[in-house]
Each structure stands twice: as C-alpha cells, then as structure tokens.
C-alpha cells in the first residue's frame, strides 16, 4: 500500500467521560471485540491479579481509576484503530486535553443513570472548539436508568448538537433484552456477564418480526413506539454534519455485559474520519505528504519500572515513519535516530518498523524529548495547540530523608516533563520546590509515584499561593524590572518559563496596573513557547 492508502485506513480516537461512567470497561470491550485481547480484565471483579488492560500504573490498579492516558492499537475490518484512553478522574483534565489534540474523533461515554455530567460538558467543549467529531455511547442500560428520550434531549441541550440514534434499547434494568440496530433493521440479543466475546449472538431481523414482540413483550412495545417517534422527529444522519461536530451518532448498551459494543466499533470504522491535516505555525501539514512529521503530545516516565525508562508518545502527523530514520527535533535542532520505537497495547509494547499519519508511536529516551516537541526529516516546524494551564492548587514539597534530595529532583523533573504535575523552582536561592496542580488527586498520585518509582518519601506542605501566571514582555528591561521587584514570587517551570506566583486575585490586578508592559498568561503553549489567553 502507498502512504495515501495507509492513511485512509487509520482511525485515531479518544474515549472521554465523567468519572465512573464505564469508560475503561468500554475500552476493554472494544479491544475484546476487535480481537486484540482474548479475555477482558473486568475492572469491577478484579479477579486475582487481573486488571484492566488500559489501567497499568500501580496506583490505577489499586484505586480503579485511569490517571495516565493509555494508547492501544488494534486492527479491525482492515482498519488500523488507535485508541487513546484518557484519565477518568476530573483532576486530570489537563492531560485529557493534551490527548484530545492527538485524535481525529472522540467516543463519549455517558452513564444512563446520571446523564450528561459536568466533566463531560467540559471535555465536550474542548472537542467542539477543535470541531472534533463525537460518537456517543450511553452505558449501563442493564441498570435502573433514565428514559432514553430524556437522555437524547439532554445531550442535545447541553452539547448543542443533534443526537441521531443508531441503536435503541429494548427494555432497561432487569428487563433489558438488547439493542435494536436502527440502520440495519435488526436486533442483537446478548447474554449478560460475558468476559469473552461471543460470535454466535442471537440476531433477529426486522422491527416487524413477531419473534421480537413475543420474546420481549411490553419492553419491545415501548421501544417500537420510541423508534417510530425518533424516525419521524429526529434529523437523518448527515456524515458532513457529524464530521463538523454538529451531529453525534448515539448508541445504547452495557459495556460490562457486551451489550452494544459491536455497533460502536463498526461505527468507528464506517463513520469516524481518517487523519486530517494539522496546522503548524509555518504551514498546513497534510497527512499524505511523503515526509514524516510528528508531535510529542505526552511523555510517560517509568512505563517499565525495572528499567526507569521514559517514553515520548508521538502522534504521526504526516508521511511514513521507519525505524532508524534520521529525525530532527525542531526545538533543539538536534538529530536523533530512534531504533527501538514501539507500538502499544497499554503497557505491553511491540517494536515497530513503520507507522503512518494517525498512528501513535512510543520513542524511549532519556529526556531528549519534551511535551510539544516536533519531529521532522529536517524541516523546522512548530505545531500549535498543546497547552499547559496555570495551576490552581499549590503545595511545597520536601524530602523526608535529606540523602534522597537528588532522587526527589530527578523524580519531579521527570514527572514535570511528563505533565503529571507542574513543578516550579523558585528564583530565590534555597527556595523549596513548589508543585502546582489543577486537582487535589494529582498531589496524591505524585507522592505515590515518587515513593514507588523513585524510592522517595516526600512531605507535602501547604503553600500560600493560589494562582500562577506565566510572564512575558516585548520590553526585556520592563520584564527584568518586574522580576527584580517581585523576586520572592518568581519561579521557573520545567522548561524554564518564568512564572509569577500569586496569593490572591487582588495581587494580580495590582501587578497588572503597576507593570502595563508585562503580560500575565493563564496558559502556556508548547508550540515554540507561544503564549495564549491572557490572565
């Protein structure tokens, strides 16, 4: 196959949801139905040492939440599917945002009992801002849940897009019998509680088939009436509207019981777009271009604790990657020749020889690559849109054993470069390192990882700071004057960008009034250190 043909069969998407909506379970079942794994590691049951394939970090196994974004690749119906499982806990929205910059579509999971929840709305706003197409899976229909028509109205109201059902539940809770595939005019009847995929599911053709009515009685009667209603009232599916983020295909099911998963997988192949062009500051990069370009959207330390490694996750933006090819790191202008590049099934890795636009590859390295780095075959490019948000919570960090100070700094540097936490180094000599986060759980995760991965017992201490703003100025003297006058509140992050640490909004307003030539930024971008959104 040539590059264009390989790109056309790629599908790269992220799974997003509110915590506990069943996202990790659905990830497992998609892998199961695609044949990538033979048995799903049920997150709820936790049989012996079996854990969900996509929850691999020690703290994730203990707490049953996804805190690092996992990447998994599988083949299904001659398509190469790159699935990115994002953090399910609300404190990790920043890492989720960065993952959403690396995908061409999103699969939104909604808990049928709770409907559209706040975290989902925030993530959907990110997708809408990027015009990312969204497929919706309404999960947990085997429980006592809300009426499907109400859920559709809520999706449309909150998300501002038309919801177009592709499948419809027959019953719910104890009377849940399966899902009716509206487009194929057939019902798939599932046996609940399966860990293994079943290739001999009961399929009943035709909405008017008397067998459905006789087997499912009043549950089917209600479903039949609702299907007739939505076929009259709901807009027809328009793929262009879907690709522009104005329509979302909706599927119902129960991931833990394998209900409705097959239909979602088929829709990802049939409806989700192949990789599209990517905007760099210099030009638009087309996926079919012959030369390789890629962006580091995530850095993960210690994927293999035995080897203390660090892997840069690179989304291939264009061309073909070949193992051992010469690549330029645009930020440093240095050359590298990665030989042991890997593809993923969560933390299980396989060496790969080639990759194409849309694929996610892992490049093991020792700090050469940072978040936002652009790799090319020689061209200088800076891709846009990979942000760091100013933290809202701060804690000082000290090491309990002074002899482990070096390990603390190494650990925090790596975790900071990975984006797990923001680390600020005070300009004032002898200042304590500060950690910045967007949610409290980040501090707990970092303390746990310092202990298990770096052998460091860290002590977290309260901080007087509540805000941070990165500072720039077109007038170097004005910036220096501000930094000298506020030296006690200046710190540097892991890429040595200067930040002003603040105790209250009033303090920020005073600084803005006194130093009009200095700009205060609530977001730092990686594309060539371009700054966005002011205070």
Curated annotation (Swiss-Prot):
UniProt xrefs under Gene3D superfamilies: P-loop containing nucleotide triphosphate hydrolases, Peptide chain release factor 3, domain III
Location within or outside the cell: Cytoplasm
Superkingdom assignment: Bacteria
One GO cellular component, as annotated: cytosol
Keywords tagged on the record: Cytoplasm, GTP-binding, Nucleotide-binding, Protein biosynthesis
Residues that hold GTP according to the record: 17-24, 85-89, 139-142
GO molecular function, one term: translation release factor activity, codon nonspecific
UniProt record similarity statement: Belongs to the TRAFAC class translation factor GTPase superfamily. Classic translation factor GTPase family. PrfC subfamily.
Protein name: Peptide chain release factor 3
Gene field: prfC
């Amino acid at each position: 196959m040539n590059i264009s043909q390989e790109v056309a069969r790629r599908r790269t998407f992220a799974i997003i949801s509110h915590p506990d909506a069943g996202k990790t379970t659905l990830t497992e079942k998609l892998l199961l139905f695609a044949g990538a794994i033979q048995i799903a590691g049920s997150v709820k049951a936790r049989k012996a040492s079996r854990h969900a394939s996509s929850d691999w970090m020690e703290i994730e196994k203990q707490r049953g939440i996804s805190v690092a974004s996992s990447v998994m690749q599988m083949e299904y119906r001659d398509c190469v599917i790159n699935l990115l499982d994002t953090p399910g806990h609300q404190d990790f929205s920043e890492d989720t945002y960065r993952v959403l910059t690396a995908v061409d579509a999103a699969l939104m999971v909604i808990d049928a009992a709770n409907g559209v929840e706040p975290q989902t709305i925030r993530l959907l706003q990110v997708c809408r801002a990027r015009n990312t197409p969204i497929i919706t899976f309404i999960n947990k229909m085997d429980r006592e849940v809300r009426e499907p028509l109400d859920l559709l109205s809520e999706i449309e109201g909150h998300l501002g897009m038309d919801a177009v059902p592709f499948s419809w539940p027959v019953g719910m809770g104890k009377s849940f019998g399966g899902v009716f595939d509206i487009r194929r005019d057939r019902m798939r009847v599932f046996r609940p509680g399966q860990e293994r995929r079943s290739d001999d599911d009961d399929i009943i053709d035709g909405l008017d088939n008397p067998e459905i009515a006789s087997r499912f009685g009043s549950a089917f009667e209600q479903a039949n009436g609702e299907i007739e209603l939505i076929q009259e009232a709901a807009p027809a599916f328009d793929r262009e509207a879907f690709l522009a983020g104005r329509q979302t295909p909706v599927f119902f099911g129960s991931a833990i019981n394998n209900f409705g998963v097959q239909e979602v997988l088929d829709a990802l192949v049939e409806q989700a777009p192949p990789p599209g062009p990517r905007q760099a500051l210099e030009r638009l990069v087309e996926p079919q271009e012959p030369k390789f370009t890629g962006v580091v959207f995530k850095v993960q330390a210690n994927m293999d604790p035995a080897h203390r490694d660090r892997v840069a996750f690179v989304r291939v933006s264009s061309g073909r990657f070949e193992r051992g090819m010469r690549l330029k790191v645009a930020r440093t202008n240095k050359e590298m020749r990665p030989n042991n590049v890997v593809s993923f099934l969560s933390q299980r890795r396989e060496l790969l020889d080639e990759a194409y636009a849309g694929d996610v590859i892992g490049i093991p390295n020792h700090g050469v690559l940072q978040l936002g780095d652009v790799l090319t075959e020689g061209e200088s490019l800076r891709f846009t849109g990979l942000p760091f948000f100013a933290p809202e919570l701060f804690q000082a960090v000290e090491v309990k054993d002074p002899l482990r100070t070096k390990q603390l700094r190494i650990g925090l540097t790596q975790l900071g470069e990975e984006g797990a936490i923001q680390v600020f180094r005070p300009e004032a000599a002898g200042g304590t390192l500060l950690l910045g986060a967007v949610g409290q759980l980040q501090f707990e995760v970092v303390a746990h990882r310092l202990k298990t991965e770096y052998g460091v017992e860290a002590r977290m201490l309260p901080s007087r700071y509540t805000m941070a703003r990165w500072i720039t100025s077109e007038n170097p003297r004005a910036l220096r004057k501000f930094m000298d006058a506020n030296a006690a509140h200046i710190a540097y992050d892991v890429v040595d960008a200067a930040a002003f640490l603040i105790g209250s909004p009033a303090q920020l307003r005073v600084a803005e009034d006194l130093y009009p030539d200095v700009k205060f930024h609530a977001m730092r971008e990686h594309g060539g250190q371009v700054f966005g959104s002011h205070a």
